Amino acid sequence: MLTKKEQRLRRARQTRIRIAQQGVARLTVNRTNLHIYASVISGDGSKVLASASTAEADVRKSLGGSGKGGNAAAAQIIGKRIAEKAKAAGVEKVAFDRAGFAYHGRVKALADAAREAGLQF
């Protein structure tokens, strides 16, 4: 029987394979207890086109003195930033790669904010 982490990694691997077959850029999300990270990777997987995380100094300042990067409000900020950076890099349409994480909470907040900022997926 697979552990919870092994199941998540298996789902993530299967998703990456399906997205690679489509050949479109992918928006990847990784979350930890303290931070959330997002990056837009080219269709062939060879280049990172844009990235944003709550570990960046600018984002930490905008979160205030608390520096809490592991909540839904921080995920919304990252969603807006990654959409702006992706559009600046010329990417408007992506496939959403949630890395096996459930589409709930911080992952959903990031995705919704990116959609509102104009990224299509």
Curated annotation (Swiss-Prot):
GO CC annotations, alphabetized: cytosolic large ribosomal subunit
CDD domains recorded: Ribosomal_L18_L5e (cd00432)
Keywords tagged on the record: Ribonucleoprotein, Ribosomal protein, RNA-binding, rRNA-binding
Classification via Pfam families: Ribosomal_L18p
The UniProt record lists the keyword RNA-binding: yes
Gene3D superfamilies from the UniProt entry: 3.30.420.100
Any GO BP: translation
UniProt GO molecular function: 5S rRNA binding; structural constituent of ribosome
Function: This is one of the proteins that bind and probably mediate the attachment of the 5S RNA into the large ribosomal subunit, where it forms part of the central protuberance.
Similarity section: Belongs to the universal ribosomal protein uL18 family.
Assembly and oligomerization: Part of the 50S ribosomal subunit; part of the 5S rRNA/L5/L18/L25 subcomplex. Contacts the 5S and 23S rRNAs.
NCBIfam families registered for this protein in UniProt: L18_bact
Name of protein: Large ribosomal subunit protein uL18
Organism listed in the record: Acidovorax ebreus (strain TPSY)
